[in-house]
Amino acid sequence: DIPSATSYYLNQGDPIDVNAIIDTVGLPCFVKANCSGSSFGVSKVHKSSDMIAAIEVAFEEGPEVIIESFLDGIEVSIGVVRYQDRVMVLPATEIVSENDFFDYEAKYLGKSEEITPARLTPAQLNNLNDLAKKVYESLRIEGFSRSEFIFVGNIPHFIEINTIPGLTGESLLPQQLKIAGISLKALFEDMVKRTLIKK
């Protein structure tokens, strides 16, 4: 079982029942496109009157929308890689955003603090590492990924996974790899070698 936020799904063209959405996920909630990156198409909705506009913004990014309940707790991002024939969970990054959530401005324009390794208790860290690895293996990922979680007490709740995470100098996965003592070059060489052996 993978704990996660309560969610409501919409496909383009589906009827939009705002009351049913709020009955399911409550307020505030997050409305986001299912296939977009860098937090494009994501809105935090506080009032029912803002729901339709937020859904329209999300549909501009893709044909599927997910609406999720708001979880109030520590937000972390954690990379998992397959390296030297084993699945390795990287040091987690704690996200402290000045904005209402970790949006584009917070990610790329300095409106957040990224703390690696995250300030977690041993129990929280064990739960996070176990769950991040479980998500990675459940989805049968072969390369690398970065997953987002929010803690409710000691329990991390899975928010989303990115199987093509950013790899710039400011991106979280390279920061986590560096602390783990793995260079991007070494990771990619290992991936190429493993792929060639499979062929």
Predicted regions and their residues:
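Short small-residue beta-strand/loop micro-motif enriched in glycine and branched aliphatics
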Residues: 39, 113-116, 169-173
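A generic alpha-helix structural signal
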Residues: 22, 52-59, 105, 129-136, ...
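Active-site/binding-pocket entry motifs
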Residues: 10, 36, 95-98, 110, ...
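ATP-dependent carboxylate activation and anion-phosphoryl transfer catalytic cores
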Residues: 121-199
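Active-site nucleotide/adenylate-binding loops and adjacent lid/helix of ATP-dependent enzymes
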Residues: 1-73
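Phosphate-binding site of ATP-dependent enzymes
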Residues: 46-127, 151, 157
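Generic secondary-structure signature for well-ordered alpha-helical cores
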Residues: 2, 59-64, 97, 137-141, ...
